[in-house]
Structure formats: C-alpha cells, structure tokens
Curated annotation (Swiss-Prot):
UniProt name for this protein: GTPase Obg
Protein family membership: Belongs to the TRAFAC class OBG-HflX-like GTPase superfamily. OBG GTPase family.
Gene: obg
Cell compartments where the protein resides: Cytoplasm
Primary localization class, coarse: cytoplasm
Domain (Obg) ranges: 1-159
GO biological process, one term: ribosome biogenesis
C-alpha cells in the first residue's frame, strides 16, 4: 500500500429527527391529549485510532463521510431512534484540523482513542412537551437541528519510539533492517527510502533470547541541507520526527560526521526547535570501512557535541547489541511522553452571536400612510429557535413570544426604542411588539 500522511476529507453528521405533533386517538375518546414523541439524535462522525495501520492511503477512495439522521418522533409518545454514528479509523498519531478555522479538533496518540469531529444534530421535542395550564393542546412541535458539517485536514505524524535521522545513504535502512523485522529497500544511492518505514526491535538477553520487551523504530527519509525550507523530501517527512520519543542521528564515518551532525540539528531547529529537546544519541555507522584508530578519533570529536556516541556497523553487526540495549535504557516512559507531546485540542464550543437589533422603516404597502417601523433581530440564538419551529410558526407564536420575553428580548427592544405596534422581524418570523410595562 502506498504511504500517505496528509488527506483532506469532508464530514457531515446526521440531522436530528423532528418532534411529532400528534394527539391521542382512541375509540370513544373524541379529544385525546397531545402525545407527540421526541425525534432521535443525529449520528456523529468519530475519528478512531487503531493499530496495524500506518498510512491514510486506505481512506483515499472515500473522501466524504456521512452519519445517519435521527428518526422522527411519532404518536403515543414514541421517540425516534438515534442515528448511527460513523467511525473513521486512522493510524495512531493522526491529527485532525478544521480546514476553515485551522483549529486542532483531534489528536489521537493512543490505540483506541476516539474524538467526535462532527456532532450530530439534536432531536426535536414532541408537542407533549409544550403543554401548560393555559396551553393544553399545543399544535406545534420542535424540529431537529442540522448535523455539523466541516472540511477536515488529516495529518499523520507516525508515533515511533525511535526515529532514525540522517543524510541520504548514511545507512539508516540497513541499520533498521539489522535491528528489526522491517524489510526496507536498500541500495548504494541516495533517497532509496521515499516514505517512513517502521520496524519492531525486540529486546534480547546476553544469550540472544528474545525478551517480552520491544519498541518501534522509524526510518525517516533522508534529510538534506535546506529540508526545513522544503528542499529534497523536505517538509513532507520532517513532521514524523516530531512524534518520536528518541532520535538516533545516523552518521557515515567515511564522510564528515561532525559537520553533518551540526547540519542535521540546524535543519531540525529550523523546522521545530523543540525537536532538539528530545533524548538523542549518535550511531556512527560503517566503522568497518575505516581503521579503528580513525573511528575512535571521530567518536571523540562527536562526543564534544554533547551527545552519547556509539560505533556500529549495520553491515557487519558490530555494536548492534550495545545500541539496542542503550535505546531500551534511554527510552522515556510512554505515558509521560504521550501526555507531554499530544497537541492541545481546542474545545468545539458553539457560541451564540451577540444580539444585534437594527431599525428600519418600510414604505406602506399601498403607498399611503406612515412608514412601517421594523426591528430586525440578529444573533442571541433567537434565529436558531425560530428555525426549530419554522413548520409551526403560526401555532407556536404565543409560545415563542413568551419564551423571547423570558430571555430578555423585549427588554432589549424597549431599550433600543421600540414602540407598541412596531413590527419585530426574526428571520422569516414577524410579530407585533407589545409593551406590557407601559
């Protein structure tokens, strides 16, 4: 399967089911009471991290995801069924961004972790809810709300315990193959590895017997000078380094390893300065190609850079057991690492817009008389409430008027200068303003 670590998708949660406007019907009962049931909740879109998946490629053929609508309520107080949620299974290490706002809406760093990225609509209430001492037979019900829709950008930052970083042809793939069960492409030319490759490294005792301890190791494609600016494979794979718990700088002893280490650290610093805070060591590779005295001299020079240095030969197997055991000892505790490296997910709150009241004068219908005084109401959540009763506005007018009064709309209109008999307009709903305090 091809490797893909960025994907744009569209998600649409299910709409809430409408409440029912119904009255009890039975033999010998001419006027039964209201018995409309509530609508069901719309299904949500849920992102879920699963193991065994290391790419977003499996989602390419399906870019749009829709959850099930809630079912409408029915008579006899029967509530509509909730819509079924839709799960999108992604690799551990997937971050979801809202494309329009750029906000982080999910960051999944553990197997089984879930996050709702599009919330299902609310079910509407049936007419049985709206009875009162003065309203014993309400002929209206509440409609369900639309499900949330959004465009989402998925970015995968592979969560590997150890990340191998180095220049092309430094021997990272050979080292990964020698330490783990991975089978990367290996050749004597740069950029053999064109996507991150994961392998599992097993701990062994002194006799070479496998123990019940392991970690994952990632071969990050070769970095070149200017990678942080997009050169070579550039930014395409630098993001994966940010998810590793420990970095191993793989350096070729036959080149200029001190200079290459400094250049690698400069590229990481330019991309994300916090990467240099990771636990790290140097694997000085291909020592079989030089005299031991020269290899030791290079090791001493590298040690002056402040990192532990181990001489290894991926080809001959020299130093691999020491490197493996050192990595097990250096790896920080996973739970502490996960807590400190997860991105902060911004709360997905819905905030009503501030109330705005705008006055206008409309010409009289027949061109005679005084202009009609109209007060437009925007925000404050009032328009959304109108939409929920749009099918029953005439019958729900009294209920809505009392609701708006309790919520302070009449006081706001009075302060704005509304007079008795003026028209109030909220979306498509129009009613006459009545000031009962005059």
């Amino acid at each position: 399967m091809a490797f893909r670590d960025v994907l744009n998708i569209e998600v649409a949660a299910g709409n809430g089911g409408d409440g029912s406007m119904s009255f009890h019907r039975a033999k010998y009962m001419e006027k039964g009471g209201p018995d409309g049931g509530h609508g069901g909740r719309g299904g949500s879109i849920i992102l879920r991290a699963i193991e065994g998946v290391e790419s977003l490629e499996r989602l390419v053929g399906r870019r749009k995801f829709k959850a099930e609508n809630g079912r409408y309520g029915e008579g006899r107080l029967r509530q509509g069924a909730d819509g079924q949620d839709t799960y999108i299974d992604v690799p551990v290490g997937t971050t979801a961004f809202d494309e329009d706002s750029g906000k982080v809406i999910a960051d999944l760093v553990n197997v089984g972790q879930e996050k709702v990225i599009a919330k299902g609509g609310l079910g509407g209430r049936g007419n049985s809810t709206f009875t009162s001492s003065t309203r014993q037979a309400p002929r209206f019900a509440e409609l369900g709300t639309p499900g949330q829709k959004r465009r989402v950008r998925l970015e995968l930052r592979l969560i590997a315990d150890v990340g191998l970083v180095g220049y092309p042809n430094a021997g990272k793939s050979s080292l990964l193959a020698a330490l783990s069960r991975a089978n990367p492409a290996i050749a004597d030319y740069p950029f053999t590895t064109l996507s991150p490759i994961l392998g599992v490294v097993q701990r062994e005792d002194e006799q070479g017997v496998s123990l019940d301890e392991r970690f994952t190791m990632a071969d990050i494609p070769g970095i070149i000078e200017g990678a942080s600016e997009g050169k070579g494979l550039g930014l395409e794979f630098l993001r994966h380094i940010s998810r590793t718990r420990l970095l191993v700088y793989v350096l070729d002893v036959t080149r200029n390893p001190v200079e290459e280490l400094q250049q690698l650290q400069a590229e990481l610093r330019a991309y994300d300065p916090s990467l240099l805070d990771n636990v790290a060591l140097v694997a000085l590779n291909k020592v079989e190609l030089v005299e031991p005295d020269l290899a030791q001299m290079v090791e001493d020079e590298l040690a002056e850079q402040g990192l532990p240095v181990l001489q290894v030969s991926a080809k001959e197997g020299t130093g691999l057991n020491t490197l493996r055991e050192t990595l097990f000892q250096l790896l920080p505790e996973f739970e502490l690492w996960a807590q400190s490296n997860a991105l902060e997910v911004e709360p997905d709150t819905v905030v009503d817009e501030a109330l705005q009241i705008v006055f206008r004068e409309d010409a009289p219908a027949k061109g005679e008389g005084a202009p009609e005084r109209v007060w437009e109401v925007h925000g404050g959540g009032f328009e959304e409430r109108i939409v929920r009763f749009s099918r029953y506005l005439e019958d729900a007018a009294e209920y809505l008027g009392n609701l708006f009064k309790r919520q302070g709309l009449y006081n706001a209109l009075r302060r704005a200068g509304a007079r008795e008999g003026d028209t109030v307009e909220i979306g498509t709903f129009r009613f006459e303003y009545f000031d009962d305090e005059e």
